[in-house]
Design a protein with these regions (language model features):
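Active-site-proximal C-terminal subdomain of hydrolase catalytic domains
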Residues: 101-167
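Proline- and acidic/polar-enriched loop/turn elements at helix boundaries
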Residues: 10, 57, 136-137
């Protein structure tokens, strides 16, 4: 047993495409159950849980992420990128996550009360994640961090994710 870690404080869209390199991926970012507009001629709206990144939108990044932006797997929020559940399903299609366990500390990962939305976890699971855990509604960082530490420490001791969360 043991734990080797890699901490990335400035996660980019490209970084999120490399989660298959890890047995356990922790998403520590802001999240939102967000309504956004898309379309040029006929405006449409969609509401979905998203993970907000600090990566700024610029000309070159927009070119690099062009297909994801056009398909709304990546959207722009206040000049930065955010990813939707479809992003993970596409990035890891064919099961490329290969059994990675994903723990999310983001707010509204599963939507909010009255509007539970599994789009992010569905994308991760369809991409081959072994298990996904996250929160509905807002979550205080102190609470999510203590839950995360307890869960990870119990998994290091040999418990399954379900056993660690049930504790």
């Amino acid at each position: 047993y043991g734990l080797d870690t890699h901490l990335d404080m400035m996660v980019t869209v490209s970084d999120l495409k490399r989660m298959a390199d890890y047995d356990l991926a922790v998403l520590s970012a802001h999240g939102a159950y967000y309504t956004y507009e898309y379309g040029w001629l006929w405006k449409k709206q969609a509401t979905a849980p998203i993970i907000l990144l600090l990566e700024k939108s610029d000309f070159w990044n927009d070119l690099r992420y062009g297909l994801e932006l056009l398909s709304h797997r990546v959207i722009k929020v206040n000049g930065c990128y955010a990813v939707t559940g479809d992003f993970f399903g596409n990035a890891y299609r064919g099961g490329k996550l290969n059994g990675t366990i994903v723990l999310s500390e983001t707010c509204e990962f599963y939507g909010r009360s009255g509007h539970v939305d599994t789009a992010l976890s569905d994308g991760l699971l369809s991409g081959g994640a072994k298990a996904v855990a996250g929160f509905v509604n807002n979550v205080y960082s102190v609470y999510s961090r203590s839950m995360l530490w307890a869960t990870v420490n119990r998994m290091i001791e040999g418990e399954t994710l379900q056993q660690a969360i049930d504790y």
